[in-house]
């Protein structure tokens, strides 16, 4: 299998899924394919980021983060540096999940906080990439009481009548979320958490070795 085999994000993710299910010995036998997949994955990410940045006149660099705090993380945006960092474990969650993470972080370049403008920008990017349907976005305000009797004001966004961003507070750090109506999150990981963790550790070791042997020259934090 060569790098050309990984001509789409879907093929990269399918390989990563199968890699997780291999025995430790079989994982080592897939070292060359893992490196090829990683290079192709970076190329696909480059293409998506460049396309969005060109369309919206943005500047953005990106790099992998193979550091310690990547469990459960997907990406981070450093808007003051015009940079995003992506955690390689995203490859185990599906191609549309990767696209969603990237577009989410790109929306943070001009909107650091999870507020109205951010979510509308995020939705617009998803629509431009045809990952969400076109349509009217409407906002609904909801006031609820917490267990201490305080009134909290939440906002939600609907796309074509379907809930798409669920409950964020405009004046706090409470993070809203894209709901299950977003088809990007309909992709469930096809392997267990434990298998995914083992696969991630093996992938990290392979990529570290490839970097040391100068098989990889892409920039990443490790």
Where are these regions (language model features)?
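Active-site-proximal or metal-binding-adjacent scaffold patches in catalytic folds
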Residues: 1-100, 109-160, 165-171, 175, ...
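Walker B catalytic acidic pair
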Residues: 105
């Amino acid at each position: 299998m060569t790098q050309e085999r990984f001509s789409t994000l879907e093929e990269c993710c399918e390989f990563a899924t199968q890699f997780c299910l291999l025995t430790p010995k079989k994982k080592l036998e897939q070292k060359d394919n893992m490196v090829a997949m990683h290079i192709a994955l970076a190329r696909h990410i480059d293409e998506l980021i460049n396309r969005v940045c060109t369309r919206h006149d943005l500047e953005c660099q990106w790099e992998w983060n193979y550091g310690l705090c990547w469990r459960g993380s997907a990406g981070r945006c450093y808007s003051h540096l015009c940079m995003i960092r992506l955690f390689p474990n995203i490859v185990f969650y599906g191609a549309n999940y990767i696209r969603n993470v990237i577009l989410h972080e790109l929306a943070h370049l001009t909107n650091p906080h999870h507020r109205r403008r951010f979510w509308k920008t995020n939705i617009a990017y998803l629509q431009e990439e045809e990952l969400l349907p076109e349509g009217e976005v409407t906002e609904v305000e909801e006031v609820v009481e917490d267990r201490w009797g305080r009134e909290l004001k939440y906002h939600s966004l609907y796309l074509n009548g379907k809930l798409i961003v669920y409950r964020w507070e405009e004046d706090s750090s409470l993070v809203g979320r894209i709901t299950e109506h977003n088809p990007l999150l309909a992709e469930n990981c096809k392997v267990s958490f434990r298998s995914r963790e083992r696969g991630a550790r093996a992938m990290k070791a392979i990529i570290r070795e490839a970097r040391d042997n100068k098989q990889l020259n892409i920039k990443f934090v490790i």
